[in-house]
Amino acid sequence: MRRFPKLTVMVAALGLTFGLSGCGKGGSSSSQSSTATSTPAATAAPAKPVHVYPKGTPIKLAFVSNNVANYWNFAHAGVRAFEKKTGIQVTFREPAKGTVAEQNQIIEDLVTEGYNGIAISVIAPNDQIRTLDSAARSLNLICVDSDAPKSSRLMYIGTMNYNAGLLMGKEIVKLLPKGGQVAIFVGNLAARNAYRRLDGIEHVIKGHNITIVAKKEDNQDYARARSNAENVISAFPHLSLMCGLYSYNGALAASAVKAAGDKGKIKVIAFDQDPDTLQDIKTGLINATVVQNPFMEGYLSCKYLRNICANGMKAVPTPANVDTGVQIVDAKNLVVYEKKLAKMMASK
């Protein structure tokens, strides 16, 4: 496939500020929310490749998720909103099984197909540096949702996951004022978004008589996620709360609680706006969920990539992070939040 001419330069990791704000926070005034301030991105190398294309060059952009989940439908809606506004088509690809091998192959294929920019949610940051760095030598690479700060990616867009964990930890303390036993459920703790959320939770619950008795990974296997929840309920008869760090974990934990007849006895806190999660908040099976803004992750990642391709590091903010924000959704503000979601999805 014909590659268009480009100017590739090596630049310092932090460039001039590009003025673009993140999303606003939704929900009612009673909801807790957190929009973190930007923090400097850690980098392994003093310089990173950026690729600037001549004016008029047709730009090929791609968005790569880390698995197939409802969460990415909202990001896809953001990508489509960008397409409608700019007329630039963006390829949206998802690794069907959520494996590193699949995602690496997608990256390599996009390079071969002559793409100019990729926004990617990295599955295992420390294990994929070689693949990411190789791609960055041929195209503009940014991370979204799950970061790989030691790679040659140019910037990160998404949740500041440690701060999201702090918010979740505060909600856990609120739900367990006398303390108790907590179990953590997650797809893959090697993913930076997952372990940073857990770091935040562990920081907040210290000194509150709250003990994490289990940390269960499922590798994006829903059947395994459900059995993990069932096994923990059986193993810990005094379990107080189940905490899901991936979008599907909360609802699957709640279904296990319901099956065990422990509704009300075992509290559940989730992550993200999965439809089953929101339904379980309505029925009282889930107490609260920490929601991100995947719509803005999709939209902003495309917008920044487009501008980087045209203007180089002048389009990268300083620090090289854009926080899309998080908030707590519970029974009090659920109706308002669902209206906000419906408006977002109308863009797809």
PLM regions and their residue ranges:
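Short, solvent-exposed amphipathic alpha-helices that sit
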Residues: 71-88, 164-168, 192-211, 224, ...
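Short beta-strand elements in bilobed, periplasmic/extracellular small-molecule ligand-binding domains
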Residues: 84-97, 181-184, 205-222
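Hydrophobic alpha-helical
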Residues: 111, 119-136, 201, 219-280
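Flexible loop/hinge segments that line or gate small-molecule binding clefts
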Residues: 125-163, 167, 174, 181, ...
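Bacterial lipoprotein signal-peptidase II cleavage site
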Residues: 21-34
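Hinge/cleft segment of the Venus flytrap/periplasmic-binding protein
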Residues: 36, 40-57, 189, 193, ...
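Extracytoplasmic "Venus flytrap"
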Residues: 46-78, 82-83, 91-105, 115, ...
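Hydrophobic alpha-helical segments within soluble ligand-binding/sensing domains
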Residues: 103, 157-182, 224-226, 273-277, ...
